[in-house]
Amino acid sequence: MRVLVLGSGVIGTASAYYLARQGFEVTVVDRQPAVAMETSFANAGQISPGYASPWAAPGVPLKAIKWLLERHAPLAIKLTGDVDQYLWMAQMLRNCTASRYAVNKERMVRLSEYSRDCLDELRAETGIAYESRTLGTTQLFRTQAQLDAAAKDIAVLEQSGVPYELLDRDGIARVEPALAGVKDILAGALRLPNDQTGDCQLFTTKLAEMALKLGVEFRFGQDIQRLDFAGDRINGVWVDGKLETADRYVLALGSYSPQMLKPLGIKAPVYPLKGYSLTVPITNADMAPTSTILDETYKVAITRFDNRIRVGGMAEIAGFDLSLNPRRRETLEMIVNDLYPRGGDLSQASFWTGLRPATPDGTPIVGATAFRNLFLNTGHGTLGWTMACGSGRLLADLIARKKPQISAEGLDISRYGKTREVAKQGHTAPVHQ
């Protein structure tokens, strides 16, 4: 059975790999010259299942108003006049209740924990190397109020059986010695000892090499133009003016997925959440982080690779704008100087931005659609790296009609209600503008 995977980020590549392991004949198509050249290229590098939480949370609407007035805010909104932007924000606000937060977080943690297990298994079987560390993630709280507010997350961790530690200032210095000199500015921390780190772009490149050995074909530099469909089936995908056909189709185009789906009558509430990162060469290993630090105040992660520090985070709701905002760089540099002033050389840092495909409830869209041969693997937001292996393996099981190892409840697009409006038979408009 032939499967055509659209998109070669970490999600598309993981989908292709796990499909090939199940015996499918897989082709991956992407406009870029190699895998992981867009959102997967320079993300924060953390694999943190226990910290899998939706942005839509109780209290966020009031916090958002405050953040809009701050210079170093973790969230910024640039109104584009796009109706989809307004609809997405309205849906997000509706998910900012305690009950919705609990449901959404459980779904995210369920998939993230499974994905971490899949990654562990993959690493044990293949020895795949991507500058990985398994030294945990430490969430830093600068105020007592932040520490107290972590109680709701801890309750979900306990319910899900995720190990954790609450740390005082001395405990922070024990697990992250380079923070000993600044521990007095912190109120405490929440540490998840089983979390991991690694270079997502390097991992995706190595996984693609392994997929090639399983027979996967990667076709780069090709423009995915439109889908042809009739009734409840996809007839093919127009790629560079040629109709490519398969038995099954997987859409893993990240933030661009809705553009492809909308003409089919499928309304996928995925919107780009722009993030930024700095990659800083380490100058003093003893003064650099040992694993991943999450700064709760600024929603920024600081992650240790072999000889580099990756600093990533923030969220701009600004459409498909990929310009580099110097104020965001200023914020990232400020946080590094605050916590690790002697760890790396900021003058040699590279600055990057990417569009994370976010859903309003935080949970990705993984599974079947109203079209019998079209499947989605998109909408992972800031957790594409954390959820990649689990999402790819889950999707492969669903396509193979095997019982997945975890419950797929609440993960496919049907959770948003009516999954397809009446669409005119034919094809979509180009997805990549």
Swiss-Prot record:
The answer on whether this UniProt entry bears the keyword Transmembrane reads no
Binding-site residues for FAD, renumbered to this chain: 3-17
Record InterPro entries: DadA, FAD-dep_OxRdtase, FAD/NAD-bd_sf
Q: Gene3D superfamilies, from UniProt?
A: D-Amino Acid Oxidase, subunit A, domain 2, FAD/NAD(P)-binding domain
Q: Which GO terms describe its cellular component?
A: cytoplasm; plasma membrane
Its required cofactor(s), as named, are: FAD
Q: Which UniProt keywords apply?
A: FAD, Flavoprotein, Oxidoreductase
The UniProt similarity line reads: Belongs to the DadA oxidoreductase family.
PANTHER family, A to Z: D-AMINO ACID DEHYDROGENASE (PTHR13847:SF280), SARCOSINE DEHYDROGENASE-RELATED (PTHR13847)
Recorded hits in HAMAP family, A to Z, give: DadA
Q: What is this protein called?
A: D-amino acid dehydrogenase
The organism encoding this protein is: Pseudomonas putida (strain W619)
